[in-house]
Amino acid sequence: MSIELDLQIACENENGLPSEKELMTWLNAVIPQFQPQAELTIRIVDEKESHELNHEYRGKDKPTNVLSFPFEAPPGLELNLLGDLIICRQVVEEEAIEQNKPLLAHWAHMVVHGSLHLLGYDHIEDDEAEEMESLETELMQGMGFEDPYIAEK
């Protein structure tokens, strides 16, 4: 089992960001359950870049917590590339405060949530959302964090 992470820090203030070791711990709690090898990029950005990408790819005129861009290999070409996660520092920090969650736990949740998207999970339909949230809760609790959806239940 191996995960190759390309970590890109593209925000002005790096204070308080999770370490590469923490990111790898969270990725290793998720990805190896689905595939033994993976390469992915995590890019931590400011609101401006998140806003631009969210507008361009999702038609939403605001920054968002995490964007997932799965890699789709051409037919017949097998690569371990999972894709890219773009995580907005300010949105994650604001949501942690609003939801009264420890900041590190919310970062972990965004990595788990985004990784599941890269692995093909979605939450557009209610049954898909239920399955994905249940898996996120199980993975988060397995790492010693609380249920990330406890406030909504």
Curated annotation (Swiss-Prot):
Per UniProt, subcellular location reads as: Cytoplasm
Q: Does the keyword Nuclease apply?
A: yes
Pfam families named among the record's database cross-references: YbeY
Enzyme Commission code? 3.1.-.-
Q: Which cofactor does it need?
A: Zn(2+)
| UniProt-recorded Gene Ontology molecular function terms | metalloendopeptidase activity; RNA endonuclease activity; zinc ion binding
GO BP annotations of the record are: rRNA processing
Q: Where does Zn(2+) bind?
A: H113, H117, H123
Q: Describe how the cofactor binds.
A: Binds 1 zinc ion.
According to the UniProt entry, the coiled-coil residues are none
| Record's keyword terms, sorted | Cytoplasm, Endonuclease, Hydrolase, Metal-binding, Nuclease, Ribosome biogenesis, rRNA processing, Zinc
The protein's matches in InterPro entries, at most eight in alphabetical order, are given as: MetalPrtase_cat_dom_sf_prd (IPR023091), YbeY (IPR002036), YbeY_CS (IPR020549)
First-tier enzyme category under EC? hydrolase
GO terms for cellular component: cytoplasm
Domain of life the protein comes from: Bacteria
Function summary: Single strand-specific metallo-endoribonuclease involved in late-stage 70S ribosome quality control and in maturation of the 3' terminus of the 16S rRNA.
Give the family, as the similarity comment puts it: Belongs to the endoribonuclease YbeY family.
- What name does UniProt use for this protein? Endoribonuclease YbeY
State the organism of origin: Aliivibrio fischeri (strain ATCC 700601 / ES114) (Vibrio fischeri)
In the UniProt record, the gene name given for this protein reads: ybeY
